[in-house]
From Swiss-Prot:
It comes from the Bacteria. It catalyses: [[Fe-S] cluster scaffold protein carrying a second [4Fe-4S](2+) cluster] + N(6)-octanoyl-L-lysyl-[protein] + 2 oxidized [2Fe-2S]-[ferredoxin] + 2 S-adenosyl-L-methionine + 4 H(+) = [[Fe-S] cluster scaffold protein] + N(6)-[(R)-dihydrolipoyl]-L-lysyl-[protein] + 4 Fe(3+) + 2 hydrogen sulfide + 2 5'-deoxyadenosine + 2 L-methionine + 2 reduced [2Fe-2S]-[ferredoxin]. It comes from Macrococcus caseolyticus (strain JCSC5402) (Macrococcoides caseolyticum). The lineage of its organism: Bacteria, Bacillati, Bacillota, Bacilli, Bacillales. Keywords: 4Fe-4S, Cytoplasm, Iron, Iron-sulfur, Metal-binding, S-adenosyl-L-methionine, Transferase. This is Lipoyl synthase. It is found in: Cytoplasm.
Amino acid sequence: MATKNEEILRKPEWLKIKLNTNKSYTGLKKMMREHNLNTVCEEAKCPNIHECWGERKTATIMILGAICTRACRFCAVKTGLPNELDLNEPERVAESVRLMNLKHVVITAVARDDLKDGGAHVYAETIRKVREVNPYTTIEVLPSDMGGSIENWETLMAAKPDILNHNIETVRRLTPRVRARATYDRSLEVLRRSKELYPDIPTKSSLMVGLGETTEEIYEVMDDLRANDVDIMTIGQYLQPSRKHLKVQKYYTPLEFGKLRKVAMEKGFKHCQAGPMVRSSYHADEQVNEAAKEKHRLGELSSK
């Protein structure tokens, strides 16, 4: 029987979506299985999978295996002892992107704290292979903090993705509880370092809300990200993947998300997606286009 608190926090109507399993979605799913690829869309139970795979021709491919060495209390990805690295994965990912005719691909990975380089070399090689085979596909990467190693981060960034995305996930106060093996300041550091290494590559970060944070703490995250030159921010509703994960403390309304987006844009982000169903890679193709337009605009202004 549900508790009184669970009754109060029953999912509101705006979080109920109609699934659209069309031919594009079915084809992409089949392709993923044929090429033995993992996707965070499936592993993390993303609510937007049908829209992204079916309508937008974008996907988030998860490399370095399907088992994460961390056990963040918000995440549905399996945890435990990872498998051996698959050194053929970069070629397989590149060919799959070609066959799926993706306009934009997000390459993410499980945390591999068991590897000295955190998987950076395989990550970088995957970026290079995807670009070699798919020169017109934009590439976004969504790595872990790789233990905070600057050397590992430099290895990854040397492959020059079109967008670097690293998620802050939650506010400073809640970070130890939500993702115990990461730190708030380390995430800010890798975002700052990425921009220092390659100023022309847009940086991006995502925040979940509904874990017990205050509005003031959300604004603090925005300020911290902007202080480290982050260009793009996404804000979405935390949804509990299972009873073992953290409970939802609040469901934000679409109007509240609209206000958060307005504040984020006023604080200087070039682009912000905010909404109940928004996830880190939601409408990622739009974000890379907006970032490219802004880069072009600034280039024109500086030449005048």
